């Protein structure tokens, strides 16, 4: 048994740098060129013409508490009011994208990530989902792959019930009692 922990400072310095997180494919580091407005409009038009099913990602960058393992784009704050201007811009972006798509295109995948999307109040979560339903063809029959990231330190039973009511499937990423 070791009597003391030895920290190798050289090793720590060598590997103390950002690397890809394998939470999605392709990973973020594989995206090298910027997508122009023309490229985006062209892709949306092609999707509309083919009536392709949609996968939507909604980023909510706010967290009340930091998770030290997290490398996501986030804003740590206890000020819940900071979400309001962000949500106003999010609604505008939803409208700007939706107007280029066909209302018959089904949203087969929807993911809310962050940050911690459950940083939003119940009313704010309802508002975002209502806006998405107004502009996109979300599935109502539980056949869609709709997921949301939560902070279990802050999610209570009423929040879990709301998420289920809004169409999110409930699962867990870890069985460890303490992850962060």
What are these regions (language model features)?
Residues 63, 90, 112, 148, ...:
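Conserved, mostly hydrophobic/aromatic
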């Amino acid at each position: 048994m070791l009597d003391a922990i030895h920290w190798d400072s050289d090793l720590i310095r060598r590997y103390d740098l950002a690397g890809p997180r394998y939470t999605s494919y392709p990973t973020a580091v594989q995206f090298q060129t910027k997508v122009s407005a023309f490229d985006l409009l062209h892709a949306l038009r092609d999707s509309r013409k083919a009536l392709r099913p949609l996968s939507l990602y909604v980023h909510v960058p706010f967290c009340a508490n930091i998770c030290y393992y997290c490398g996501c784009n986030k804003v740590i704050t206890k000020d819940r009011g900071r979400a309001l201007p962000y949500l106003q811009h999010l609604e505008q972006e939803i409208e700007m994208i939706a107007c280029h798509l066909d209302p018959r295109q089904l949203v087969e995948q929807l993911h809310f990530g962050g940050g911690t999307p459950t940083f939003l109040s119940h009313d704010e979560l309802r508002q975002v989902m209502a806006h998405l339903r107004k502009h996109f063809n979300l599935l109502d029959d539980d056949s869609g792959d709709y997921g949301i990231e939560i902070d279990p330190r802050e999610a209570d039973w009423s929040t879990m019930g709301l998420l289920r009511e809004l169409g999110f499937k409930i699962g867990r990423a870890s069985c460890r009692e303490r992850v962060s």
